[in-house]
Amino acid sequence: MILGSLSRAGPLPLLRQPPIMQPPLDLKQILPFPLEPAPTLGLFSNYSTMDPVQKAVLSHTFGGPLLKTKRPVISCNICQIRFNSQSQAEAHYKGNRHARRVKGIEAAKTRGREPGVREPGDPAPPGSTPTNGDGVAPRPVSMENGLGPAPGSPEKQPGSPSPPSIPETGQGVTKGEGGTPAPASLPGGSKEEEEKAKRLLYCALCKVAVNSLSQLEAHNKGTKHKTILEARSGLGPIKAYPRLGPPTPGEPEAPAQDRTFHCEICNVKVNSEVQLKQHISSRRHRDGVAGKPNPLLSRHKKSRGAGELAGTLTFSKELPKSLAGGLLPSPLAVAAVMAAAAGSPLSLRPAPAAPLLQGPPITHPLLHPAPGPIRTAHGPILFSPY
């Protein structure tokens, strides 16, 4: 019984507490390999002293994914174009399209900015009075109310003469933006226009933009530019007239938009400078200047043949003889003609020349035959082989 109990109770502790198994090998802790390159490369103690090639290999092998750098945005704000590289941007900036846009913007700024107008950000020059939106300097309250200025005010001193009053009419005097009347023609206006054209590389007369001063000089020496200048001044074959009639000596010159132009070479009349430029560029005007015939007229003319030309020459040679015969008729010639007509009744009779002196025909002296024998015409002769 005791042995049996011992044998039964023996295996129970083995089932209740499993035996502790000792690992055959000591498992060391696995080293973590993070994705960042700095801790990974920190494993190598001599990384800082390595060769650059080895550093590059280790960085490529153990380093993390390369971060994509954001590409800088390269664009042209004037032309509204975006580029993929700096070389494309430089090529665009050197091109004609960008240059034309820049010149147009500069020309618009120059037109809008006159000498009497200043930009909002520009400082006011010393001694200048502020102006309102209409370009007229504001007057003091005392002047608006009808009262004169103070005795010591700089507006009007006792010894200074008062300027003459000028009626403000919109017909005779044109006021500038600064409030002063603009003169009709300035002596230095042409020089200022030439300097402005050289600065902007733009011909305002022909509406042509160029890329260099040499091209501008070549354009100014060209035929088209000179022809338009002559048309405006009226010195060349193209004359300018006002639309409503001939110009009055006392009236100022009409602007170019209100004038018509007549080309005396081609006998063509146009109503504006745009049509004049088109006509000057046409083949018809160029051929007319070169002295060539008008192709539109010569196209419809038929070439005359050699027979017609010979007949014309013969008629021109016989015309004086027929005129002389009509003026001084000889009896012998008239008798010979009548005899020839009697001998061959089917022969064609020449048309008599029209007499220069209108009146009743004188037939009696002309019908008398001339003295002497008259040779009659022979009859037809037939040739036969037999």
Curated annotation (Swiss-Prot):
Post-translational modification summary for this protein: Ubiquitinated upon prolonged exposure to genotoxic stress, which leads to proteasomal degradation of ZNF385A and releases p53/TP53 from cell-cycle arrest target gene promoters.
Positions annotated as zinc finger (Matrin-type): 74-98, 201-225, 261-285
Protein name (record): Zinc finger protein 385A
PANTHER family: DOUBLE-STRANDED RNA-BINDING ZINC FINGER PROTEIN, ZINC FINGER PROTEIN 385A
Necessary for binding to ITPR1, CEBPA and p53/TP53 mRNAs as annotated region, ranges: 145-351
Modified sites of kind Phosphothreonine: T248
Pfam families xrefs: zf-met
Tissues expressed in: Expressed predominantly in the retina.
Assigned GO CC terms: chromatin; cytosol; dendrite; neuronal cell body; nucleolus; nucleoplasm; nucleus
Subcellular locations according to the entry: Cytoplasm; Nucleus, Nucleolus; Cell projection, Dendrite
Gene Ontology MF annotations: DNA binding; mRNA 3'-UTR binding; p53 binding; RNA binding; zinc ion binding
PTM annotation (Phosphoserine): residues: S185
SUPFAM superfamilies, sorted: beta-beta-alpha zinc fingers
Main location (coarse class): cytoplasm
Description of how the protein assembles with itself and partners: Interacts with ELAVL1; the interaction is indirect, mRNA-dependent and may regulate p53/TP53 expression. Interacts with p53/TP53; the interaction is direct and enhances p53/TP53 transactivation functions on cell-cycle arrest target genes, resulting in growth arrest.
Organism lineage string: Eukaryota, Metazoa, Chordata, Craniata, Vertebrata
InterPro entries the UniProt entry points to: Matrin/U1-like-C_Znf_C2H2, Znf385, Znf_C2H2_sf, Znf_C2H2_type
Bilayer-spanning residue ranges: none
UniProt entry keywords in alphabetical sequence: Cell projection, Cytoplasm, DNA damage, DNA-binding, Metal-binding, Nucleus, Phosphoprotein, Repeat, RNA-binding, Transcription, Transcription regulation, Translation regulation, Ubl conjugation, Zinc, Zinc-finger
Chain residue ranges for the region called Disordered: 90-193, 279-309
Induction: Up-regulated by p53/TP53 in response to DNA damage and oxidative stress.
Gene: ZNF385A
One example of a Gene Ontology biological process annotation: negative regulation of intrinsic apoptotic signaling pathway in response to DNA damage by p53 class mediator
Basic and acidic residues bias spans: 103-121
General function of this protein: RNA-binding protein that affects the localization and the translation of a subset of mRNA. May play a role in adipogenesis through binding to the 3'-UTR of CEBPA mRNA and regulation of its translation. Targets ITPR1 mRNA to dendrites in Purkinje cells, and may regulate its activity-dependent translation. With ELAVL1, binds the 3'-UTR of p53/TP53 mRNAs to control their nuclear export induced by CDKN2A. Hence, may regulate p53/TP53 expression and mediate in part the CDKN2A anti-proliferative activity. May also bind CCNB1 mRNA.
